[in-house]
């Protein structure tokens, strides 16, 4: 009976997603997906090149697949005051295998000095949206006592198209002032049409605002000096898409190579959604050459009406790598704190 219940829950989620507007996924480890969070964070790190990848397996207890992946590569080009990069994002949702693949180019330009850096970023790319209509379950295929009846036929007529391409654009701004960072971004500025049927279904803009503050816990701390900590870094991220709002708020404790975090996230209407625990490990493979490998793991304990017993929560894993190029001068136009120092 539990299996039938979970299956019907998965079907409901899929059908809801098709009948309403498509809502973007959000990462609990937003700090390990900078290119996805805000294009203005492109090139905002200490080395010459940065690679990031993050995978989210949402509500693994349900039979329908809800998984998301983002991979990015960006270059820090301080002599030109900015950075360039590429971002690939893939999502797979529900038993109907509703999939999105997006590839986008990012560019960011920064102005300022040692104490203050203001960055502006733009993003432009293309998305392919696909669905397998044969995997959908319609109402006339569900028995009130037995649930879904495998092999049963439906009289529902499905659209002729199962794939859609569209252009997508975003922009953002980010400010770093001493131990404070704040940013904002707007995604889907052009509100692309995602419809498979010809009936217009525009993707609403996603608004994101984030802020972090770096609090040194050591009496030996001096601004602008390299220090392994310890630090407390409280952060908040606000998301809004159409009439759905969400807030992630919490703090990270960072000491040397270990970063632990505890977060609270609200659901679309402001009610509790999840408690998130994260662990980040920085492995410096070659400090002199700026080589750093970052490994991250987090788990969301669902607190909403779709409870933890049914969903088994959500798990994210991330990996990042950054380094200087051979024979790099290590020249950095901005010698103060960068976005990297806030996560």
Cite the ranges covered by each PLM segment:
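Bacterial N-terminal signal peptides that target proteins for export
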Residues: 1-8
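Bacterial N-terminal signal peptides
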Residues: 9-17
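Sec/Tat signal peptide C-region and signal peptidase I cleavage site
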Residues: 18-22
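Outer-membrane beta-barrel translocator/channel fold
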Residues: 23-36, 40-41, 56-58, 62-65, ...
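Transmembrane beta-strand segments of Gram-negative outer membrane beta-barrel proteins
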Residues: 43-55, 84-86, 234
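Transmembrane beta-strand segments of outer-membrane beta-barrel domains in Gram-negative
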Residues: 51, 64-67, 141-187, 193-199, ...
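Detector for outer-membrane/organellar transmembrane beta-barrel domains
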Residues: 170-192, 200-256, 263-265
């Amino acid at each position: 009976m539990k299996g039938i219940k979970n299956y019907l829950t998965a079907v409901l989620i899929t059908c809801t997603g098709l009948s309403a507007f498509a809502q973007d996924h959000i990462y609990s480890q937003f700090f390990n997906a900078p290119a996805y969070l805000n294009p203005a964070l492109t090139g905002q790190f200490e080395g010459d090149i940065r690679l990031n990848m993050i995978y989210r397996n949402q509500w693994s207890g349900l039979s329908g697949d809800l998984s998301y992946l983002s991979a990015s590569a960006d270059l820090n080009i301080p002599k030109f005051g900015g950075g360039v990069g590429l971002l690939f994002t893939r999502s797979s949702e529900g038993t109907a295998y509703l999939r999105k693949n997006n590839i986008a180019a990012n560019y960011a330009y920064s102005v300022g000095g040692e104490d203050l850096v203001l960055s502006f970023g733009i993003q432009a790319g293309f998305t392919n949206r696909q669905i397998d209509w044969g995997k959908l379950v319609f109402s006339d295929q569900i028995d009130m006592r037995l649930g879904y009846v495998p092999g049963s036929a439906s009289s529902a007529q499905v659209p002729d198209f199962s794939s859609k391409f569209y252009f997508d654009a975003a922009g953002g701004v980010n400010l770093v002032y001493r131990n404070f960072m704040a940013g904002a971004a707007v995604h889907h500025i052009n509100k692309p049409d995602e419809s498979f049927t010809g009936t217009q279904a525009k993707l609403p803009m996603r608004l994101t605002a984030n802020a972090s503050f770096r609090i040194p816990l050591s009496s030996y701390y001096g601004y602008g000096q390299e220090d392994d900590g310890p630090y407390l870094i409280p952060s908040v991220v606000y998301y809004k898409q159409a009439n759905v709002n969400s807030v992630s708020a919490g703090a990270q404790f960072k000491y040397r190579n270990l970063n632990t975090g505890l977060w609270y996230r609200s659901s679309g209407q402001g009610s509790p959604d999840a408690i998130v625990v994260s662990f980040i490990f920085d492995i410096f493979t070659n400090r002199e050459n700026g080589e750093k490998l970052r490994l991250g793991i987090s788990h969301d304990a669902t607190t909403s009406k779709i409870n933890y017993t049914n969903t088994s929560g959500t798990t994210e894993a991330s990996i990042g790598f950054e380094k200087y190029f051979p024979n790099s001068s290590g020249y950095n136009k901005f010698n103060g704190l960068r976005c990297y120092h806030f996560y």
